Amino acid sequence: MEFSKKTRELSIKKMQERTLDLLIIGGGITGAGVALQAAASGLETGLIEMQDFAEGTSSRSTKLVHGGLRYLKQFDVEVVSDTVSERAVVQQIAPHIPKSDPMLLPVYDEDGATFSLFRLKVAMDLYDLLAGVSNTPAANKVLSKDQVLERQPNLKKEGLVGGGVYLDFRNNDARLVIENIKRANQDGALIANHVKAEGFLFDESGKITGVVARDLLTDQVFEIKARLVINTTGPWSDKVRNLSNKGTQFSQMRPTKGVHLVVDSSKIKVSQPVYFDTGLGDGRMVFVLPRENKTYFGTTDTDYTGDLEHPKVTQEDVDYLLGIVNNRFPESNITIDDIESSWAGLRPLIAGNSASDYNGGNNGTISDESFDNLIATVESYLSKEKTREDVESAVSKLESSTSEKHLDPSAVSRGSSLDRDDNGLLTLAGGKITDYRKMAEGAMERVVDILKAEFDRSFKLINSKTYPVSGGELNPANVDSEIEAFAQLGVSRGLDSKEAHYLANLYGSNAPKVFALAHSLEQAPGLSLADTLSLHYAMRNELTLSPVDFLLRRTNHMLFMRDSLDSIVEPILDEMGRFYDWTEEEKATYRADVEAALANNDLAELKN
């Protein structure tokens, strides 16, 4: 379905003419999830995003649908249970996006180690029980030191005592956002990026009835009326709540910055994702992950009070990560000059909430009695003297300072909150990308209750656990063969096998629409056929307005294909210029945007 600059203009026009049931401010993963469920449930839905979709936090994650094994150090079972359950749901509704990728976790005998081999085994067995993969080929394995080094011979040998392998999944975070957005558009939502909420509309009683918005492309200011407005702006949540300039000024959010660095795979060759302690005794862990022909690693976790739109990688961030990675991979000797790309993102943590990210933070402790009982039960389970039900009973009796009962009752998912201010504004904040659907579901339950009670508007919510995103109309049990069939269709349209498979995996059930463009398009000068098709599909069906949108978020060219990027920037500018009829001045502006984004990702300031 068309989702383009033209439909954007039409959506802005319609938003001015109607009273919406729900207006969503924020087009990251949280807002995208709410938009999909609202539109599919029949609500008159609008969404505005001041940047591009996923430009903030939601395209700057570690790019995993991570199960949170680390939380089991404190046997924080609720968060892991929720996370692996939601991960399974994402596999159902977006089966072309998460890809299984077993994680290697080496264990070192050192101060501050997260796991001993025994604790790791207990944690992995619990993890498998929660994920439902016990006694399957995906079940965990405990490895000896030699077995770890056989898998990853370039790891540091000193202090290594063994390790484990457990099931995890890689993710394309920005694609997950756009596929939710596209499905909402398909179901009738009115959606526009580069539109900023600058204030609220109020009735005589002080209740919010809409927003004053600015189209950042035309500078047009207009009003959008809505029965309910929900704020899903992540790190910007406080700023949006404070737009009313009435009463309390909110300071709920405590953003932290996470940095990832990308190098060529020749600098660190990893055959699978690796997850290990920093070795600094700071209680944190770091990922090293293969992607395309690159290796990336992260993340940092530092409090952040700077520019929310443009968080930057600092020398301190680089030194921290390079020190850790060079220690664990002593033959790598990576320097800042080896870094090909990078990104810095902000986690929308809620101040005072016990849930940090899955790489760090103190998630509390459990009592010695609870721990000893659990260990004894798990040992008996492993020797077949106890049942899974016995383990689950022991888990349920854990006395944890981070138990769900200690969370704010407004939480709709671990680490998230749903609040309604006196003026009627709803704010859905916090959480993790894996939990986005559950967060949206909790918010939508509240939304339909309010619409019924206060506006006599009745809606029946969809079952969002089975409702596919755009591109997700695949049989989850047969994804590989369906993707293969799409790839062969691409080959029949003139693509080589590698390109066809790349696009089939990227677009899922939308791949035939991408390949069909080959009938009407000529290959753009300087671009491959695959890039030509992908670019035109992005402009026509993914509301892609700039080269940076395409290179950084609709695809991963800017992050993981740095070698070939310089050669396609000008051809992309030319092709987008032809499509959008840009003037030379407009093209120069977009060229400058690309150069600025590349300089930022390449760490040009730090290297000079």
Curated annotation (Swiss-Prot):
It is found in: Cell membrane. The keyword Membrane applies. SUPFAM superfamilies: FAD-linked reductases, C-terminal domain (SSF54373), FAD/NAD(P)-binding domain (SSF51905). It catalyses: sn-glycerol 3-phosphate + O2 = dihydroxyacetone phosphate + H2O2. Its cofactor is FAD. One of its GO terms (biological process) is glycerol-3-phosphate catabolic process. Its EC number is 1.1.3.21. Keywords: Cell membrane, FAD, Flavoprotein, Glycerol metabolism, Membrane, Oxidoreductase. Belongs to the FAD-dependent glycerol-3-phosphate dehydrogenase family. This is Alpha-glycerophosphate oxidase.
